[in-house]
C-alpha cells in the first residue's frame, strides 16, 4: 500500500515538472526542486524554514531525476516577500551608456523594463526631429509685434477728408457752367476798341446758347475767346486813349510856346 502511494506521488511530481518545462510557468504547488542529490528546498534561508517540505522518493525516480536537467520551482508569494525585504520600491535611473552595455551583454530572449527620466521639452526649449533639444533664453526669443497708433488713424482720416473735399471742389468747378463775360464784352464794345468789343459780345451770346444746349465744351471755348477779345479790346482802347492824350498835350504845349 505504501509503495503505491509513493509511486503516485512520484508520478504527480514528474507530471508537474514536465508541465513546467513545456509552458515555462512557475509552479505554485510544489515547493521542492530536483537536484543531483534529490529533492531539496529552494528556500534554505532560516526565515523560510517553515516552507521546507520533506518528501521521500523511490530509488528509481531519483535515478531518473538525476538524468533530467536541474529545475527550480519558485513560490511567487514568498519570492515577493524576499525581494521586498532587500529592495524598497523605487525607480532606478541609468544612463544611456550603461543601458547600451547591458543590452549587449544580456541574451536575446530576455526582456527587461527600465525607467528613465522624461525628456519632454520645456516651455523654453525646442524639439528637433532627431530628438535633440535646444534651450532658448529670454534674450533669444523674439516676438514680432505690430503696433497701431490711434493718432495716425485720425491724421489719415483728416487727409482723406481734405482730399475728398478738394476733389469735390474740383468736380464742382468743372461742373460749373462757363461764364459768358457779357458785361466785359459790352464795356469793351462801347468804351474801348469797338471792333474787338463787338466780337467779344457775339462770343458771349454763343456761350449762353451752348450752356442752354448742355454743350459745356463749346461753351467753355466760346467763353475763353470772348474773355480774350474783351481784354484785348480794353488794352487797345486804353492804348488809344493814352496816345490821344499824349498827342493832345504835346500839341497844346507847342501852341503855348508859339
Swiss-Prot record:
<keyword id="KW-1133">Transmembrane helix</keyword>
<dbReference type="GO" id="GO:0150052">
    <property type="term" value="P:regulation of postsynapse assembly"/>
</dbReference>
<keyword id="KW-0735">Signal-anchor</keyword>
<keyword id="KW-1003">Cell membrane</keyword>
<feature type="transmembrane region" description="Helical">
    <location>
        <begin position="182"/>
        <end position="202"/>
    </location>
</feature>
<dbReference type="GO" id="GO:0014069">
    <property type="term" value="C:postsynaptic density"/>
</dbReference>
<dbReference type="GO" id="GO:0035254">
    <property type="term" value="F:glutamate receptor binding"/>
</dbReference>
<dbReference type="GO" id="GO:0031901">
    <property type="term" value="C:early endosome membrane"/>
</dbReference>
<keyword id="KW-0628">Postsynaptic cell membrane</keyword>
<dbReference type="InterPro" id="IPR007593">
    <property type="entry name" value="CD225/Dispanin_fam"/>
</dbReference>
<keyword id="KW-0597">Phosphoprotein</keyword>
<dbReference type="Pfam" id="PF04505">
    <property type="entry name" value="CD225"/>
</dbReference>
<keyword id="KW-0812">Transmembrane</keyword>
<comment type="similarity">
    <text>Belongs to the CD225/Dispanin family.</text>
</comment>
<keyword id="KW-0967">Endosome</keyword>
<comment type="function">
    <text>May regulate AMPA receptor content at nascent synapses, and have a role in postsynaptic development and maturation.</text>
</comment>
<dbReference type="GO" id="GO:0051965">
    <property type="term" value="P:positive regulation of synapse assembly"/>
</dbReference>
<dbReference type="GO" id="GO:0042803">
    <property type="term" value="F:protein homodimerization activity"/>
</dbReference>
<dbReference type="GO" id="GO:0097091">
    <property type="term" value="P:synaptic vesicle clustering"/>
</dbReference>
<feature type="topological domain" description="Cytoplasmic">
    <location>
        <begin position="1"/>
        <end position="181"/>
    </location>
</feature>
<keyword id="KW-0472">Membrane</keyword>
<comment type="subunit">
    <text>Homodimer. Interacts with GRIA1 and GRIA2.</text>
</comment>
<dbReference type="GO" id="GO:0098839">
    <property type="term" value="C:postsynaptic density membrane"/>
</dbReference>
<dbReference type="GO" id="GO:0098978">
    <property type="term" value="C:glutamatergic synapse"/>
</dbReference>
<dbReference type="GO" id="GO:0006886">
    <property type="term" value="P:intracellular protein transport"/>
</dbReference>
<feature type="intramembrane region" description="Helical">
    <location>
        <begin position="229"/>
        <end position="249"/>
    </location>
</feature>
<keyword id="KW-0966">Cell projection</keyword>
<dbReference type="GO" id="GO:0030672">
    <property type="term" value="C:synaptic vesicle membrane"/>
</dbReference>
<feature type="modified residue" description="Phosphoserine">
    <location>
        <position position="137"/>
    </location>
</feature>
<dbReference type="GO" id="GO:0043198">
    <property type="term" value="C:dendritic shaft"/>
</dbReference>
<dbReference type="GO" id="GO:0044297">
    <property type="term" value="C:cell body"/>
</dbReference>
<protein>
    <recommendedName>
        <fullName>Synapse differentiation-inducing gene protein 1</fullName>
    </recommendedName>
</protein>
<dbReference type="GO" id="GO:0043197">
    <property type="term" value="C:dendritic spine"/>
</dbReference>
<dbReference type="GO" id="GO:0005886">
    <property type="term" value="C:plasma membrane"/>
</dbReference>
<dbReference type="GO" id="GO:0060076">
    <property type="term" value="C:excitatory synapse"/>
</dbReference>
<feature type="topological domain" description="Extracellular">
    <location>
        <begin position="250"/>
        <end position="258"/>
    </location>
</feature>
<feature type="topological domain" description="Extracellular">
    <location>
        <begin position="203"/>
        <end position="228"/>
    </location>
</feature>
<dbReference type="GO" id="GO:0043231">
    <property type="term" value="C:intracellular membrane-bounded organelle"/>
</dbReference>
<keyword id="KW-0770">Synapse</keyword>
